Amino acid sequence: MNAKFILLLLVVTTTILLPDTQGAEVIKCRTPKDCADPCRKQTGCPHAKCMNKTCRCHRCG
């Protein structure tokens, strides 16, 4: 019983802490401005960050 509770707590915590990003396609960038148009095409939302020369697209809402 105790092991099942800990496993359930671990699963819930992991799903909460996962980032809300989409990144099926690798988009190279130098600045966040380089990510706005490709992310708008990919997700419908221009919210993005350039991290380690790769765009990270975020969903709206």
Curated annotation (Swiss-Prot):
Q: Which residues carry this modification: Cysteine amide?
A: C60
What domain of life does the native source organism fall in? Eukaryota
Q: Which GO terms describe its molecular function?
A: ion channel inhibitor activity; potassium channel regulator activity; toxin activity
Where is it found, in Gene Ontology cellular component terms? Answer: extracellular region
- Range of residues in the leader sequence: 1-23
What is this protein's tissue specificity according to the annotation?
Expressed by the venom gland.
Q: Does the keyword Transmembrane apply?
A: no
Question: Where the protein is mainly located, per its record?
Answer: secreted
Q: One of this protein's Pfam families, by short name?
A: Toxin_2
User: Which Cys residues form disulphide pairs?
Assistant: C29-C50, C35-C55, C39-C57, C45-C60
Give the protein's function.
Blocker of voltage-gated potassium channels.
According to its UniProt record, which protein family does this protein belong to? Answer: Belongs to the short scorpion toxin superfamily. Potassium channel inhibitor family. Alpha-KTx 06 subfamily.
Domain description? Has the structural arrangement of an alpha-helix connected to antiparallel beta-sheets by disulfide bonds (CS-alpha/beta).
Report what the protein is called.
Potassium channel toxin alpha-KTx 6.8
